Amino acid sequence: MSVEVRIPTILRTYTGGEKIVTAEGASLQELVANLDSTYPGIGERLLDESGLRRFVNVYLNDEDVRFLDGLGTEVADGDSVTILPAVAGG
């Protein structure tokens, strides 16, 4: 299943500057693993030992995956995943 993944500026060093890449997988977990095999190092920027990093937001077709099934969220051919780093300020 081919899924379009939108990469934030801060992570484009891993994708050779590409803003949009494609990845394969039946779940978000598989998709991240596929991204990391194609773009080594990107996985550790997205995940920690407990799952998605706290300050990384991931959206599947504009739905926050934290309110779906997290890393177990199923993805389908033609879906769109957007990765956004959380922004904090004071």
Name the predicted role of every residue range.
Residues 1-89:
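Ubiquitin-like/PB1-type beta-grasp interaction modules and other compact soluble beta-rich domains
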